[in-house]
C-alpha cells in the first residue's frame, strides 16, 4: 500500500472557485470568490496537497486563470498540482518555475504522447497525466470531445516514461456525489505500475474509508471537491482516518 493522499480540489473559472456537474461549464456552482483564501483554509485544515484546475484553460488550451493560481501559490506552502490548458513545454516550464509542484497533462497526453515523455524526462517526478473517462473512453479539450483511446491504453503508453501519477476521473460521477468508480480506477491501477489517484464522485467519509481498504492498496489517493464544500466530509475525520490506516500499516496490523 502506497501513502494515500486526499487532495482538496480548487477548480477555477473566471478567477473564482467553482464546482461543475459532470464537467458542464453551464452548471458551475460558485463556492468562493477568493481561491487563495480557500487554498489557505485547506492548508490550515491539515491537507498535505492541493489539486487545482484551470477550467477556462482546459477549454482554451492555454492558461486562463494565471492570477488566481499565482495568488494560491503565494498563500500556501503545501505542494500544489495544477491542470488545465497545459499543452506546451513553455507552459510546463512556466508553472514549475512559479512554484507549482506537479503539472497535470490531459488533452496533450492523448494528442502528443511524446510531449509528455519529454516533459517527464526534463522534470522527473513533476509530471502527472490526467485521464478523464466518459463511457470508458478518454475525453479531451475540457471534456468537450471524446477520443477512441481507453483509460488503460493511455496509461500504458506512459508506463516507462517516468510519469509521477495518473489521475483518473469518471466524468459521469464528477460533481454529482455518487461515489468513486472504484472498479474502473482499480482496473487502471492494476494495468500500470504508475501511482493512480481517484477522482470524480467522492461523496462521503465512507468513500474515504473505501480507498483505505486492502483491495484498494494500489491507489495513491483521491480528490475531493463538492463533498468538501458541501460539508459532507469533515476534513479532520477524513485525515484522521488516513493517519490511522497508515499507522496500522506500519505496525503490521
Curated annotation (Swiss-Prot):
Q: What Gene Ontology cellular-component terms does the record carry? A: cytoplasm
Task: Give its localization.
Answer: Cytoplasm
**Which EC class, in a word?**
isomerase
> What EC designation does it have?
5.3.1.16
Q: Name one Pfam family in it.
A: His_biosynth
Keywords (alphabetical) are: Amino-acid biosynthesis, Cytoplasm, Histidine biosynthesis, Isomerase
For this UniProt entry, the molecular function terms from Gene Ontology, in alphabetical order, are: 1-(5-phosphoribosyl)-5-[(5-phosphoribosylamino)methylideneamino]imidazole-4-carboxamide isomerase activity
The domain of life is Bacteria
Active site: which residues?
11 (proton acceptor), 132 (proton donor)
Q: What is the name attached to this protein's record? A: 1-(5-phosphoribosyl)-5-[(5-phosphoribosylamino)methylideneamino] imidazole-4-carboxamide isomerase
Originating organism: Methylobacterium nodulans (strain LMG 21967 / CNCM I-2342 / ORS 2060)
Amino acid at each position: 500500500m502506497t501513502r494515500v493522499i486526499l487532495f482538496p480540489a480548487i477548480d477555477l473559472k473566471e478567477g473564482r472557485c467553482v464546482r461543475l456537474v459532470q464537467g458542464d461549464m453551464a452548471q458551475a456552482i460558485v463556492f468562493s470568490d477568493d481561491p487563495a483564501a480557500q487554498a489557505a483554509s485547506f492548508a490550515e485544515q491539515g491537507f498535505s496537497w492541493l489539486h487545482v484546475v484551470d477550467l477556462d484553460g482546459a477549454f482554451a488550451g492555454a492558461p486562463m486563470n494565471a492570477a488566481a493560481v499565482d495568488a494560491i501559490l503565494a498563500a500556501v506552502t503545501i505542494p500544489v498540482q495544477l491542470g488545465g490548458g497545459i499543452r506546451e513545454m513553455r507552459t510546463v516550464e512556466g508553472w514549475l518555475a512559479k512554484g507549482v509542484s506537479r503539472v497535470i497533462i490531459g488533452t496533450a497526453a492523448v494528442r502528443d504522447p511524446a510531449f509528455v515523455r519529454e516533459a517527464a524526462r526534463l522534470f522527473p517526478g513533476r509530471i502527472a497525466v490526467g485521464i478523464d473517462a466518459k463511457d470508458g473512453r478518454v475525453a479531451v479539450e475540457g471534456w468537450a470531445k471524446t477520443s477512441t483511446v481507453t483509460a488503460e491504453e493511455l496509461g500504458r503508453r506512459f508506463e516507462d516514461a517516468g510519469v509521477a501519477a495518473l489521475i483518473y476521473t469518471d466524468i459521469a460521477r464528477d460533481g454529482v456525489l455518487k461515489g468513486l468508480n472504484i472498479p474502473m480506477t482499480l482496473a487502471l491501477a492494476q494495468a500500470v505500475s504508475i501511482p493512480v489517484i481517484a477522482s470524480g464522485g467522492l461523496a462521503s467519509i465512507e468513500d474515504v474509508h473505501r480507498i483505505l481498504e486492502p483491495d484498494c492498496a494500489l491507489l495513491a489517493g483521491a480528490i475531493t471537491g463538492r463533498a468538501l464544500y458541501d460539508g459532507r466530509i469533515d476534513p479532520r475525520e477524513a485525515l484522521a482516518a488516513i493517519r490511522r490506516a497508515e499507522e496500522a500499516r506500519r505496525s503490521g496490523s
